[in-house]
Amino acid sequence: MWSLLTIFFLQFANKAGSDIVCLSPTALEMREERGIAIDSLDYAVSPLYLDSISHLGAEVLHTSRWFNGATVEANEQTIQAIKQCTFVDTIYLTRTDEESSVIPPLSLRKREVIIGEGQEAKGERLEAKGEGLKQLVQLNLLPLHQAGYKGQGIRVGIADGGFYNADSLESLPHDQWLGYTDLTDDKEDIFGQTGNHGSLCLTAIVAHKEISDGTLAGTFTYSGTATEASYYLFKTEEHATESPKEIDNWVAAIEMADSLGLHIVSTSLGYTTFDQEHFNFAYADMNGCTSRGAQASLIAARKGMLLVTAMGNEGNKTWQYLSTPADADSILSVGAVNKDGAIATFSSYGPSADGRVKPEVCAMGEGTSLISPANNTVITSNGTSFACPLIAGMAASLWSALPQATNMEIREMIIRSCDKYSQPHEQYGYGIPNTWEAYTMATTDLPNTKHQTPYTKIIHNGQLYILHEGKRYNVLGCRL
């Protein structure tokens, strides 16, 4: 017998009685500027259907207009009654109560949210060596910042698991904070001591700090990659469980980002295996089409957003490959390198299961400088989690310099500026982008954004392999 903690995703047959377009004035303006038409995916889920399943005893946790459904909590009696509803097309189990009763062992949890702050005590000394700008230098981002483009006018979302002290951290520009939403069951203070992973990722984008050793010559700067961008925070990670329900939380965040008119969403999360093995993905599922997260990523791209997603830290583990939603098409998945540009051994491998180059880009994810939300000092940590926001902020700065560009034009310029663009690699992808080159490229040769996979070669263990052309997808992320 199922308990009230069993969670399902219900997919409805249609949107009868729905006449609400779920887009803010800001989002509508963005759509108009970019010529993106309103379609059925922009309309809310039928309120009639939501009322009906609520009256049957289900608790609606959140809805999905893109997938025309709702994530609900229900017991067996309620779900049997819902099965009789003609407007319910499909029912998916996403979490059972067995995995809610105890926090699973750390080894079974997402590696992406495991961070290390072992160098926190050395933070200020690291800055004295000029470490605070190293990750910007590697991306050749400083010339764009010096030209005055630091993400102003660009709205960035961060989807993560906790934002400890992000509401008060001195190094963050709080006047640029747009708001936050908790899409989890935790319903705890997202700024409390329930996780700082999101805060660390946020500092890589918007934090700014001047550091001095007491002399004029000893003044140094920590800077994020888009210190003038506005930002919105989404908590999508459940602390006690690892289940597909978290993917539904994330999809809800991406849909909300679209409704708010955000330009970019940075996601340092990934999914491969879960607390209950029958939910697990296989590598074959990392095809940009199987998970709702990957499908939602493609829809977001069609709606004008640029999603930037961490590849994962499985390169030296049994899984080895990328996670979802990093497998999605039309996004930027991000691998990790060190300060010398060498690939981090933990950075997950591509390509996607259907042969597309993954990751698209790399940034510093080994020894990344961040601001500690605990005490506002500069620390270093490792993970594609921290390479990801560097690229998200870089894209925001580039977009602020080219405000008329589309999301796919920004994506393509970034990819084409990479140092391995002509010979992508299974861990580097197209390599490390050159921001200034991407910017200057736009003034001379705006890229053909329809050419999403310009090369079908990849280097594996020093050998050259020829890949088949990546599949194309329709707006729902289904393979054509």
Predicted regions: what is each one?
Residues 8-108:
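Inhibitory N-terminal propeptides of secreted protease zymogens
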Residues 145, 151-152, 168, 233-330, ...:
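Substrate-binding/access-modulating region of protease and related hydrolase catalytic domains
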Residues 171-178, 339-385, 422:
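Catalytic-core environment of secreted peptidases
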Residues 439-471, 479-480:
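Residue-level detector of functionally pivotal "anchor" positions at catalytic/ligand-binding pockets or at interdomain
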